[in-house]
Amino acid sequence: MSDPNLNDDATEPRGLAADTADDELDIVEAADEQDEFEAAEAEAGEPAEVAALHIEDEGDHIAETDEDIEAGAVETDEDVETDTDEDVEAGTDEDVAVAEAAEEEPAAPVDSIQALREELRTLPGEWYVIHTYAGYENRVKTNLEPRAVSLNVEDYIFQAEVPQEEVVQIKNGDRKTIKQNKLPGYVLVRMDLTNESWGVVRNTPGVTGFVGNAYDPYPLTLDEIVKMLAPEAEEKAARAEGKPAPQRKVEVQVLDFEVGASVTVTDGPFATLQTINEIKSDSKKVKGLVEIFGWETPVELSFDQIQKN
């Protein structure tokens, strides 16, 4: 028969041993967990706490960087605004200076002759010279435009001009300045030469023909037409600018002839012009009657063909 006390003593060591084994197992497991944790940290490269600290530091650094960027952006905006304002002010000052300089400096004078040359170069058509009866120049010029329209050639006949010049006439002691035809008996016409336009010009009352070949006249050169129209262009430009007309040499004509006077013919077959019926100062001619074989015949003579009796 066994002793109960012995059984209890035997049981206690076994329970103690079991507890000890459990404790050792817990220690081993804890050690294993510690080893696993350390291995994980080693693999991560740094402890979790240090990583957390680094994350916080990086957050602070990012925040500081954002603040720096914002501050830099503000400074940049201020710099840009300042530079822009300075540039605008500088540009405005320069514009004002340029405007003032432009006001102070007079505009370069325009060469009226060169301007006329450029204008004539761009105009359509060419310039031709037509011959007219003496004293019919302005009448031919006035009639050409309506004739061109009525005969449907206004697209070919563009312009007619009678060049004028100033002369001084002295008659009976009186001196006066007048304008007269520079080319007595001639009219300048700008046109495209076609059979139709040629016919309209040639058959205008007062026209005797084209200068040059009757059916194929030659046009004036640019230099020739500029020379003829330059005086009027200069006067027109001077009036537009409010300036006096350019000074040029003016012809002086002394008219010693009067209507009704008797003169002697110094050139030609006529000895005496009985009576002057008309004086044409523009063409420097007179009309009168001469006796030929006992008959009075009307003639036209120039000033240099007669002298006062």
From Swiss-Prot:
PROSITE patterns linked: NUSG (PS01014)
Signal sequence segment: none
SUPFAM superfamilies given in the database record: N-utilization substance G protein NusG, N-terminal domain, Translation proteins SH3-like domain
GO biological process: DNA-templated transcription termination; regulation of DNA-templated transcription elongation; transcription antitermination; transcription elongation-coupled chromatin remodeling
Stretches of the chain forming a coiled coil according to its record: none
Membrane-spanning ranges: none
Keywords from the named record: Transcription, Transcription antitermination, Transcription regulation, Transcription termination
GO cellular component: cytosol
Residue ranges, compositional bias (Acidic residues): 65-91
UniProt-annotated stretches for the region Disordered: 1-24, 58-91
Claim: Zinc-finger is one of the keywords in the record: no
Functional description taken from the UniProt entry: Participates in transcription elongation, termination and antitermination.
Family (UniProt): Belongs to the NusG family.
Alphabetical list of HAMAP family matching this protein: NusG
PANTHER family, A to Z: RHO-INTERACTING TRANSCRIPTION TERMINATION FACTOR NUSG, TRANSCRIPTION TERMINATION_ANTITERMINATION PROTEIN NUSG
Protein name: Transcription termination/antitermination protein NusG
